[in-house]
Amino acid sequence: MAFNIHNRNLLSLEHHTNRELRYLLDLTRDLKAK
């Protein structure tokens, strides 16, 4: 499931849910593995 992270500040983690943060971590892991 994708999340809309457009125009969101990733420097401030307080505005993100745990689910969104997990998605971003999984996405970076997958991109790094390519």
Curated annotation (Swiss-Prot):
GO terms for molecular function: ornithine carbamoyltransferase activity. Its EC number is 2.1.3.3. GO terms for biological process: arginine catabolic process to ornithine. Coiled coil: none annotated. It comes from the Bacteria. It is found in: Cytoplasm. Its main location: cytoplasm. GO terms for cellular component: cytoplasm. It catalyses: carbamoyl phosphate + L-ornithine = L-citrulline + phosphate + H(+). The keyword Chaperone does not apply. Probably nonameric or dodecameric. This is Ornithine carbamoyltransferase, catabolic. The lineage of its organism: Bacteria, Pseudomonadati, Pseudomonadota, Gammaproteobacteria, Pseudomonadales.
